[in-house]
Amino acid sequence: MKPCIFTGSAVAIVTPFCGDGVDLEAFDRLIERQIQGGTDAIVVCGTTGEAATLSYNERMALIERCVRTVDRRVPVIAGSGTNSTASSIALSKAAQSVGVDALLTVTPYYNKASQSGLVQHFSAIADAVDIPVILYNVPSRTGVGCTAQTYQALAKHPNIAGVKEASDDFDLIQDTLNLCPPGFTVWSGNDGSTAAIMALGGKGVISVAANVVPREMHELTQLCLENRFLEAGTLQLKLHELIRALFCEVNPIPVKAAMELLGLCSGELRLPLCRMSERHLEQLSSALKPFRSSV
């Protein structure tokens, strides 16, 4: 059986900007806050980290900085997927060379590859590296999704460790868990589905909300891992309004606003993303109030 890269809550960490550049000092502070808050792994340069608007040099600077600052205290997972197989391989190999523990590779967006194309794409990336690869299925953003049969085929690859499943398709998730061997791990890609997916056999979440409430997301996943699902359900419900507010506009617009409201980093975004509406900002500010004392 393949070893599980992490169980629990991995933060999909935001990228703090400062003018035209990345604020690496603020990034260090965010990493330390996550580790102190009990986060079980850190995902750098994912969707929430605005990877699509980062240059190659910026991505590598963030990945290297994360590896150095974390210093082996928790696993570091680098987002290395693009809609070009060759570019994804190059970024994956570069991330491996600076010491990341695993890679997160999104389904190629815009191209709308067939299932055979997806198998070949992910297999080519996994062939090119010697560290675990996590698939990332988010069809609402990419325009294409994996089937359970595709996961079953990919699960045979020794370097493919599992999937961040952000489709919220529970038929797909159950089929995947039934078809794939136990060593193929499923992680929730949606904060609001964490307890439900873990009740089916998922091992944790790659979380947006953990940027704001790392302790609570860690606690939620630990309760699930301990089969304390009644308590987990209570905490999931407590987090519901906050999670809803964090997705009232497209991610990561609300979470960047939340980080600024809490004084954790600038809420600056890169175009084509822009700041959220005043109406939604009021909703977010209200949802944050019960958690301000824990931040």
Where do the model's predicted regions map?
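C-terminal alpha-helical cap/extension of soluble enzyme domains
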Residues: 8-16, 33, 37-39, 199-202, ...
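Alpha-helix N-capping/helix-start residues
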Residues: 19, 24, 56, 148, ...
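A general structural signal for well-ordered alpha-helical segments in protein cores
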Residues: 27, 59, 63, 88, ...
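Short secondary-structure transition/capping segments
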Residues: 54-57, 90, 115-118, 146-148, ...
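Alpha-helical structural signal in soluble globular domains
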Residues: 37, 61, 65-70, 94, ...
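Active-site beta->alpha loop and helix N-cap motifs at the rims of alpha/beta catalytic domains
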Residues: 2-11, 15-143
